[in-house]
Design a protein with these regions (language model features):
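N-terminal Rossmann-like NAD(P) cofactor-binding subdomain of oxidoreductases
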Residues: 256, 349, 376-378, 390, ...
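Short acidic, glycine/serine/threonine-rich loops at helix termini
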Residues: 144-145, 166-177, 208-215, 259-265, ...
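Adenosine-phosphate binding glycine-rich loop
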Residues: 7, 32-33, 275-279, 295, ...
């Protein structure tokens, strides 16, 4: 057994463990280091005497001190850097801080602050994390995976860095997303950090600012495309199957065309999913189902308009159709229920241009006629307000990345059509949101139910506070990952995401829904993730693709896999 595997085994338990390290070498192991919390006895046994200040502190005191440090910093990027430094020094303390202050710190370790960190990556990096794979490594990817110091990786988040949040191609800077996402897998679902691996598939960048930067840390070439890109992805998938055959692979921030076809190509060859498509779909579906509790109406009776026909929008629309089908809706009802717009306006069959990726969501002649769009010419363009007035949607979803795209006339048209508009401007970061919640509430006369992709404060409308829930994928992907790991599922089917959405909707308390919130508090993330994981393991069992466990065994198996960041005694 390698020394790395030994570290992993020892950090998975909380009873007394033999570290295998002494002195400075022990303090340099982030998964074992306790800093000033080493006891007097441990300091003597482990040759730490004199290497630490005299006072022995508790984990709780360390958490309080770290929060004091963070709150003293001048801005959120400095807080991000401070948390990253803590993660590099003492992972148990890092995750204890996150778990205890998740609602305050989630915007720092992930959206929106991680976006700024990714943009500045080459100039703020202190210590590299994860694995970096470039086209120069295509013939030796298994060797690179073995260079990772972990022998039992169960969860990989991999990005090619081309569509980082709503910020585009950030090259090597995109690594901040897998690192941040895996931090939330651990903080949110208790997946042990020693079983996770962030991966940057650094295939270059087409962002001139980065290529011209003499301090840029990535592979300094134009982005790999076409057959060469496909060969590289194939080599990576084969290598993961070879080296980490039990790992779940989550694709992250691939551009639309690659995201859809890579998901469809590999989802049954390797246990994998795309969070931007499927995780986003599940968290949005969860918010929709929560809203339907307030509306007291079935999904199959709703009409939805999407502004944005990229991977996220198509993923949401696919899951909406699956949920409608589960309710018993027929094909015609499902096709009429969804209208999608992109940068060229309404998406319909004969439109020119129309990308192949969008054809599955394009309206046909019958659906167009049903909504009053007669004799559409290939060059016809219909904007959002026109589509809203024709379709009369009850739900409006934005994944366009276009700030201000939900205009006042569009929202007012929706409010005229339905008594309680459900408006979801989901684009990240905050600067990309389709509309501000305060504007939506004003334009809808305070009747809208609003959830956003980035965090927003409550909105006061005519003396009544409205909570703005955040449709954060972190409500879904930790539980999906944990459930897939525990179930040992051979694939991650759509049924997992619909199950996660249904579970998430049940986790939003009535008191929050009464104030307009479509999602639970982020401080409830561990409770939500556990519930989703249990449901996913049951779904895997019922579908015959996972372990055969009864319901009590499932709960025990999930609980056994959840790691709590506490210090074990060391001998």
């Amino acid at each position: 057994m390698t020394q790395a595997a030994t570290i992993e085994e020892r950090t998975m338990v909380t009873e007394a463990v033999d570290t295998g390290f002494r002195g400075i070498e022990l303090l340099e192991q982030p998964l074992l280091n306790k800093d000033t919390a080493f006891t007097e006895e441990e300091r003597d046994r482990l040759e730490l005497r004199g290497l630490l200040p005299a006072r022995v502190t508790t984990l709780e005191e360390q958490v309080a001190l770290e929060m004091e440090h963070l709150r003293r910093k001048d801005d959120d990027l400095e807080r991000f850097i401070g948390l990253a430094a803590l993660q590099d020094r003492n992972e148990t303390l890092y995750y204890r801080v996150l778990v205890d202050h998740l609602e305050e710190l989630m915007p720092i370790v992930y959206t929106p602050v991680v976006g700024q960190a990714c943009q500045d990556f080459s100039h703020i990096l202190r210590r590299p994390r994860g694995l970096w794979i470039t086209p120069d490594d295509e013939d030796r990817i298994p060797d690179l995976l073995r260079n990772a110091w972990l022998d039992d990786v169960r969860l990989i988040v991999a990005t090619d860095n081309e569509r980082i949040l709503g910020l585009g191609d950030l090259g090597a800077g995109g690594m901040g997303i897998p690192v941040g996402k895996l931090a939330l897998y651990t903080a949110g679902a208790g997946i042990h950090p020693a079983r996770t691996l962030p991966v940057s598939l650094d295939v270059g960048t087409d962002t001139e600012r980065l290529l011209a930067d003499p301090l840029y840390l990535g592979w300094p070439h134009p982005r790999l495309r076409g057959e060469a890109y496909d060969r590289f992805i194939e080599a990576f998938v084969e290598a993961v199957n070879e080296v980490f055959p039990h790992a779940v692979l989550q694709w992250e921030d691939l551009k639309q065309h690659n995201a859809i076809r890579i998901l469809d190509r590999y989802r049954r060859r390797i246990t994998s999913f795309n969070d931007d498509m499927q995780g986003t779909a599940a968290v949005v579906m969860g918010g929709i189902l929560t809203a339907l509790r307030r509306l007291d109406a079935p999904l199959s009776e709703q009409r939805l308009v999407f502004l944005g026909a990229g991977a996220a929008g198509i993923g949401i629309a696919r899951l909406v159709r699956s949920a409608m089908r589960a309710e018993g809706a027929d094909e015609l009802t499902m096709r009429r229920a969804i209208a999608m717009l992109d940068s060229h306006g309404l998406v319909f069959d004969d439109r020119d241009p129309l990308d192949d990726d969008k054809r599955e969501m394009a309206l046909g002649a019958k659906e167009l006629s049903h909504h009053g769009f007669d004799a559409c010419e290939p060059q016809a363009r219909y904007d959002l307000e026109t589509v809203i007035r024709r379709v009369r949607p009850s739900i409006l979803i934005g994944t366009s990345g276009t700030p201000g795209a939900f205009t006042e006339p569009a929202i007012r048209a929706m409010a005229e059509a339905v008594p309680t508009p459900v408006v979801l401007p989901l684009s990240n970061p905050t600067s990309k949101t389709e509309a501000l919640p305060s504007d939506i509430m004003a334009w809808s006369g305070g009747r809208a139910l609003v959830a956003t992709g980035s965090p927003f404060d409550p909105v006061d409308h005519e003396g009544r506070p409205h909570l703005i829930g955040q449709a954060n994928n972190a409500f879904v992907f930790p539980g999906i990952g944990l459930g897939t790991i525990v179930s040992e599922a051979r694939e991650v089917p759509d049924a997992f995401f619909l199950a996660a959405a249904e579970t998430l909707a049940l986790c939003t308390e009535e008191s929050r829904l009464a104030q307009g919130a479509l999602y639970p508090s982020q401080s409830d993330l561990r409770r939500v993730s556990r519930a989703i994981a249990i449901r996913v393991v049951r779904e895997a069992r019922d579908l015959g693709i996972g372990r055969h466990l009864d319901d009590d065994e499932i709960e025990s198996a999930v609980d056994a896999e959840i790691w709590e960041p506490v210090y074990p005694e060391m001998v």
